[in-house]
Amino acid sequence: MPREKKKRGRRAEKSQSKRKREDEEGSDSPKRQRTTNEDNDVQAGDDYIPLVTHDTEKEQEQGQEDDTPFYGLLDTEEQEYFSKASQTLELNSFEDDDDKRLFIESVYTEAKGKELKIACSQSCSRLMEKLIAMSTPDQVKALFEKFSGHFLHLVQHRFASHCCECLFIRAAPIVTSEMEKPKDKKKDRKQTTETNGEDGEQDEPMNQKPAMDLFLGVVSELEGNWGYLLTESFASHTIRVLLLILAGEPLADHSNARVLASRKKENVDSITSTAQAELTIRESRQVPAEFNSTLRKMISDLSAGLNSTYLQALATHPIGSPVLQVILSIELGCMGKEKVKDKSSVFRRLVPDDTLETKEEGVNFLNSLFYDPVGSRLLETIVRVAPGKFFKTFYKTIIRERIGSLARNEIASYVVIKVLERVSREDLQSAIESILPEIPSLVQRSRLNVIKTIIDRSTVRSADTTSLAKALESAYGEDGLVRLKTILGVEATDKDAESVKPKAATSAQHLHGSLLAQAMLQAPGRLATMIQTSFLAAPVEILIQIAKNSTASRALQEALKPSKSNTQFRRQLLPQFYGQMCDLSLDSSGSHVADALWDATSDLVFIKQRLAQELVDNESALRDSFLGRAVWRNWSMDLYKRKRGEWMSRAKGLDNPRVSAPTADSSAEPAKSKLDLARARYAARAEQQEKPDSREQGPRGKKQALSAPSGLLKAQ
């Protein structure tokens, strides 16, 4: 008799037990089930941390995924259209502004009702950023209203968060413009309503909310979720932008640029933004009073649920620390001294008032930030914007005795740079003496940022740099040629030398060396002489090699800048370029050196004539090259060939708009300041008012009173 087919082994037993469990689920078990309250019978103290199991973590993740809305996907035809529109905007090959405006309006018409889809699309979100950067204020506000109600989800989206940042940055100047001209806008609205009549489509922009209300709506929409948005990888960037906008701080400032976006982010604004738009985001803006109150409430809500321990842990968090930097810069720089003294402020919760003097927890916290790659950036922010009283205590208690060892460290040296930029002349001089023993090791490891900062600040503070020059001379050697090669990194030109070190590391070292050489050339005295003697000791081949190097040529251009103190140096160096003008003019980096030779020979006309003759001899080669034509134009060689007399006057600085405009007009009257112009207008107005009443009034009447400012002008 055939047997029944059965599975053998553990798999069969497992399936049978699974069926039994499924059958038993329907029947009520007589055993009492444990409730959730009984799991947490333990009394929670201050140090109690609840146990989060894997099941609860999965449930939370599943809940977050379910809460995230799905706005839909674009069709294939829509994706093709928007990708072509993105390419068109990037090329920016429009005939005029009207053509560009009509194209943007057509794209907005096609995108109507699909704005959220485009913002969340991987391929089309960049189009949305470009559109926002090129849009008019009405279009920006209309798109702002389309996003309203969805910002909590959009700021956490990988692609839509970038669109939100771009939208906030573009809408920030609109708030200021609406504050400055509210009356004119009312008149414009009346005129437009009269002309448009009862057309609903034309009246739609007139019903828009003010930009201030739109921003306040974003804050209220995100309110209550600051805790997890603070450390969310995408939303944290948007929070930083929002904080700076509410505070009226510059959005493209050098100090704020690194906390707004990462280095990997594509700079779409550089392609689409205009000069006026760049100017508006680089300047501080006037913000309404509602922004100030909202900003204070937002910062208090951000830090309300965070104790001092969590705040100190947030200082080294790679995502939360930049937000903390923005909060500290706003608290210490915008909210005044009262906020700094407030014990509930973020700054005082991180560093209590008396901890630096008693050497308690605050000092340990600050010491831990020096060597942390993330925390050191927060410490740089504290050093940059902290009140003067706190900075002096911080410098005397923590920095002064160990500034040499801190300057030697790769991470802590950046904090030392910020400290050196703020200390007084006496403290700078003592800091130089403390760092001098570390100069050889800094030079050996190519960590030249601290040395460059010392030279720059010594030039500003008029500090003595003789001891620093001796230390650098002993570290680099007395041979000028070897010193120049080491600083600028021109000795590593062979293939074997280039294969020893990574390309990125060597390029960074060469950049720091070039910046150090430029700083030494700008400093008076022995430091500048060190670089000048090194250039004079270099043969022609090395000079041409330096001129053709994109990094090292900057130092050569700085050395060629004319001044009264380096006339003898230029007289000796410039003949080294005889016979090299054509070679330099045809090189991308050397062409800049060729342009610098025009200014370098402003008081050495006989050298300029010889260099110009070399350009004439190689005219055909120069005209065949784009770089050569630029050098030919900058040297005014057409004028040299046709009107030699006019070229000579321009070469001497008598008719050169680039160089001699200030010197040519030196005999004329200096430009009047705004105060002088205002005084002149006041005096002219006074003379006009006094003419009809001069017969009726006496010597002490209106005429004498009004003529007093003109008398003051003559006295001045």
Curated annotation (Swiss-Prot):
<feature type="repeat" description="Pumilio 1">
    <location>
        <begin position="110"/>
        <end position="145"/>
    </location>
</feature>
<dbReference type="InterPro" id="IPR001313">
    <property type="entry name" value="Pumilio_RNA-bd_rpt"/>
</dbReference>
<protein>
    <recommendedName>
        <fullName>Nucleolar protein 9</fullName>
    </recommendedName>
</protein>
<feature type="region of interest" description="Disordered">
    <location>
        <begin position="1"/>
        <end position="70"/>
    </location>
</feature>
<dbReference type="GO" id="GO:0000447">
    <property type="term" value="P:endonucleolytic cleavage in ITS1 to separate SSU-rRNA from 5.8S rRNA and LSU-rRNA from tricistronic rRNA transcript (SSU-rRNA, 5.8S rRNA, LSU-rRNA)"/>
</dbReference>
<dbReference type="GO" id="GO:0000472">
    <property type="term" value="P:endonucleolytic cleavage to generate mature 5'-end of SSU-rRNA from (SSU-rRNA, 5.8S rRNA, LSU-rRNA)"/>
</dbReference>
<feature type="compositionally biased region" description="Basic residues">
    <location>
        <begin position="1"/>
        <end position="11"/>
    </location>
</feature>
<keyword id="KW-0677">Repeat</keyword>
<comment type="similarity">
    <text>Belongs to the NOP9 family.</text>
</comment>
<keyword id="KW-0539">Nucleus</keyword>
<feature type="region of interest" description="Disordered">
    <location>
        <begin position="653"/>
        <end position="716"/>
    </location>
</feature>
<feature type="repeat" description="Pumilio 7">
    <location>
        <begin position="576"/>
        <end position="613"/>
    </location>
</feature>
<dbReference type="InterPro" id="IPR016024">
    <property type="entry name" value="ARM-type_fold"/>
</dbReference>
<feature type="repeat" description="Pumilio 4">
    <location>
        <begin position="361"/>
        <end position="396"/>
    </location>
</feature>
<feature type="compositionally biased region" description="Basic and acidic residues">
    <location>
        <begin position="12"/>
        <end position="37"/>
    </location>
</feature>
<dbReference type="GO" id="GO:0005730">
    <property type="term" value="C:nucleolus"/>
</dbReference>
<dbReference type="Pfam" id="PF22493">
    <property type="entry name" value="PUF_NOP9"/>
</dbReference>
<dbReference type="GO" id="GO:0000480">
    <property type="term" value="P:endonucleolytic cleavage in 5'-ETS of tricistronic rRNA transcript (SSU-rRNA, 5.8S rRNA, LSU-rRNA)"/>
</dbReference>
<keyword id="KW-0698">rRNA processing</keyword>
<feature type="repeat" description="Pumilio 2">
    <location>
        <begin position="146"/>
        <end position="181"/>
    </location>
</feature>
<dbReference type="GO" id="GO:0030686">
    <property type="term" value="C:90S preribosome"/>
</dbReference>
<dbReference type="GO" id="GO:0003723">
    <property type="term" value="F:RNA binding"/>
</dbReference>
<keyword id="KW-0690">Ribosome biogenesis</keyword>
<comment type="function">
    <text>RNA-binding nucleolar protein required for pre-rRNA processing. Involved in production of 18S rRNA and assembly of small ribosomal subunit.</text>
</comment>
<dbReference type="GO" id="GO:0030688">
    <property type="term" value="C:preribosome, small subunit precursor"/>
</dbReference>
<feature type="repeat" description="Pumilio 6">
    <location>
        <begin position="534"/>
        <end position="575"/>
    </location>
</feature>
<feature type="repeat" description="Pumilio 3">
    <location>
        <begin position="305"/>
        <end position="342"/>
    </location>
</feature>
<dbReference type="InterPro" id="IPR011989">
    <property type="entry name" value="ARM-like"/>
</dbReference>
<feature type="compositionally biased region" description="Basic and acidic residues">
    <location>
        <begin position="687"/>
        <end position="699"/>
    </location>
</feature>
<feature type="region of interest" description="Disordered">
    <location>
        <begin position="179"/>
        <end position="207"/>
    </location>
</feature>
<feature type="repeat" description="Pumilio 5">
    <location>
        <begin position="397"/>
        <end position="433"/>
    </location>
</feature>
<dbReference type="InterPro" id="IPR040000">
    <property type="entry name" value="NOP9"/>
</dbReference>
<dbReference type="GO" id="GO:0000056">
    <property type="term" value="P:ribosomal small subunit export from nucleus"/>
</dbReference>
